[in-house]
A protein has these predicted regions:
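Sec-dependent N-terminal signal peptides
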Residues: 4-13
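Sec/Tat signal peptide C-region and signal peptidase I cleavage site
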Residues: 13-19
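Short amphipathic beta-strand segments in non-cytosolic proteins
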Residues: 42-62
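Glycine-centered loop-to-beta-strand initiation motif
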Residues: 64-72
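A short, solvent-exposed beta-strand micro-motif common in secreted/extracellular proteins
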Residues: 76-89
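Extracellular beta-sheet/turn segments enriched in Thr/Pro/Gly and aliphatic residues
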Residues: 97-114
Length: 114
């Protein structure tokens, strides 16, 4: 009976640890040329140059919140090309690519639009 209880106890820890695995995520903060956060900026992520150039087939997209932040959850652990835009400002000319994301981690980056 003691062995069965021990086995059940150990297997329950295994189930809990598998359920707590962190999925790869990316938190982007969009700032203007003065360093202020930008609310309402449109952000798109692309995996390849062709899609980035044509602005089609974004793997994820959204709009920044009032703190200039957007979160992408459960995404691939790859390098992304980014377009961030609000009005006549965007990130072209710099900061267009994010290095490979670390798998099963909370990744962060800042994009500057001007």
């Amino acid at each position: 009976m003691k062995k069965i209880f021990t086995l059940l106890l150990l297997s329950s820890f295994t189930l809990v640890s598998e359920a707590q695995i962190i999925k790869t995520s990316l938190t982007l903060t969009v700032r203007d040329e003065l360093g202020n956060t930008v609310e309402g900026a449109t952000v798109m992520l692309f995996e390849n140059d062709a899609d980035y150039a044509s602005e089609k087939n974004a793997v994820a997209e959204g709009i920044t919140d009032k703190k200039g932040v957007i979160k992408f959850k459960d995404i691939k652990s790859v390098s992304f090309l980014v377009i961030a835009r609000k009005g006549d400002k965007d990130n072209s000319g710099g900061g267009e690519q994010i290095g490979k994301l670390e798998a099963n981690k909370f990744n962060k980056a800042t994009i500057v639009i001007q």
